[in-house]
Amino acid sequence: MQCIAFHQFASSSSLPIWSSIDNRFTPKTSITSISKPKPKLKSKSNLKSRSRSSTCYPIQCTVVDNPSSTITNNSDRRSANYGPPIWSFDFVQSLPIQYKGESYTSRLNKLEKDVKRMLIGVENSLAQLELIDTIQRLGISYRFENEIISILKEKFTNNNNNPNPINYDLYATALQFRLLRQYGFEVPQEIFNNFKNHKTGEFKANISNDIMGALGLYEASFHGKKGESILEEARIFTTKCLKKYKLMSSSNNNNMTLISLLVNHALEMPLQWRITRSEAKWFIEEIYERKQDMNPTLLEFAKLDFNMLQSTYQEELKVLSRWWKDSKLGEKLPFVRDRLVECFLWQVGVRFEPQFSYFRIMDTKLYVLLTIIDDMHDIYGTLEELQLFTNALQRWDLKELDKLPDYMKTAFYFTYNFTNELAFDVLQEHGFVHIEYFKKLMVELCKHHLQEAKWFYSGYKPTLQEYVENGWLSVGGQVILMHAYFAFTNPVTKEALECLKDGHPNIVRHASIILRLADDLGTLSDELKRGDVPKSIQCYMHDTGASEDEAREHIKYLISESWKEMNNEDGNINSFFSNEFVQVKQNLGRASQMIYQYGDGHASQNNLSKERVLGLIITPIPM
């Protein structure tokens, strides 16, 4: 057996469960930083292979050559009956990489310069805000971040220093508020008091006649923080206005207007909760190219950027597809969801920019690992086996493998090798050995999975509070964000590391709660069929006697409250964490809601999930 490049560490001590779940989940009645030069971003040139030190080899797993040898006492085990993947190896490898090459790059660069001149050259204040909004919704704002921040900073400064600022109407006020909040400028919610009836304290009734103003206020309200009552009132008020407008529009039997499409889209999910790529595709195809004042340069740039990024994703997916086939994990662990493409789809939501290819590839492998751990606990492992697996991980000792069944040996080897691969990369880029941090989180993850397994086998029905306190840690958000921290942070600080390892800061907690609850909303019906520990919806029903519909509404409310808490954290200037890491945290919440918006988008392979993969990864937008 070849030796791994890292020494084994001492056993982890028992892990405290950090939690401060408040009564929303009960029924309603710096130390010295480790500074290294900023690492170069991994580019597409090292997708196919990455050289490693000759002393670093993965541990080889030779215990499983025949898939059938992994299965023992099969009659005692549950089965989810997951179907085979609809995206085969041959299909992925046959994808044509259409939008690559110097001619496309040259054209994109030319268009980018034109759009930059356009953005800087706009003199009218409202027109400039509208252009920024359009650029964002077209999915190309990441190319103009410096220019956008400079423009918004100037507007923010002028507003603060000018005793007589521009007297905007509701539409313009809401648009500026949303854009400034989005980029971290502290704009007070009280600016919307100008649109309230001073006698009643309520928003003026005639706002319902200004549908673009109401829509703008609705979108702005989702940038509210915990305790901002004006924005909460705005959300409730404008939701009623937009639903009324939607009802009136649907009764006209005419073709949907662009405003109607925007209203329906917003009511389905606000912009703040949407991932950039899916919003860009929808806005390009459904709205922008149908607008009478559409700018051809902007449209061509947005389409070309989308398609060139998609070609990058296809290259990455081919690399991952070869890795998955060579690993034989699908054959050795036949009970596990074989959903490589869906695991990759998460990454398009988390970090879509072209320079983050290596992160998307490694994070996809991490999602594969989390899927294996999840299915092993939820579906296949016996309680005794799961305890043995957690013990083996905690000791991090290959000698423990003799106690495990063959299928768990495979899972352990994959966990062991992947963790050490990540640690090797972190050592190269940061000069820091992080394996103890990552290992501790993996052990913690399995302990919380094990708790759910104990509930299932004992028939125990947890309260909603018990479930969420355990579930936001069993869903794996803390593991995902630990990986992201090292990918997007330089220098690494001990304060942040200790916070991530032991304290589970709010920046991790709230994103993980959204992931947990969105998962529950999307997967409940499938999990009821196969039998599983009660999820948040069932826990609330059991706690309160509520119907399933009422319980779902309560879980949606908890998601909304978690977003407010996340918005609070985004404005925390004393945070240990970089803006890049904060963006990943936000995008994890957004990706969660995309994947589970119409059901179990991670496993079910229904038509809506298939269309999402086709639209974001497979099929280019016609030029």
Swiss-Prot record:
Residues involved in (2E)-geranyl diphosphate binding: 337, 374, 378, 516, 519
Influence of pH: Optimum pH is 6.5.
Tissue: Trichome.
Annotated metabolic or biological route of this protein: Secondary metabolite biosynthesis; terpenoid biosynthesis; Terpene metabolism; (4S)-limonene biosynthesis; (4S)-limonene from geranyl diphosphate: step 1/1
Residue positions of motif DDXXD motif: 374-378
Top-level taxon in the UniProt lineage: Eukaryota
Listed Basic residues bias regions: 37-51
Temperature note: Optimum temperature is 40 degrees Celsius.
Keywords from the UniProt entry: Chloroplast, Lyase, Magnesium, Metal-binding, Plastid, Transit peptide
GO biological process: diterpenoid biosynthetic process
CC per GO annotation: chloroplast
Chain residues that bind Mg(2+) 3: 519, 523, 527
EC top class named in words: lyase
Gene Ontology molecular function terms on file: (4S)-limonene synthase activity; (R)-limonene synthase activity; magnesium ion binding; myrcene synthase activity; pinene synthase activity
Known function: Involved in monoterpene (C10) olefins biosynthesis, constituants of cannabinoids and terpenoids-rich resins. Catalyzes mainly the conversion of (2E)-geranyl diphosphate to (-)-limonene, and also produces minor products such as (+)-limonene, (+)-alpha-pinene, terpinolene, (+)-beta-pinene and beta-myrcene.
Stated name of the protein: (-)-limonene synthase TPS1, chloroplastic
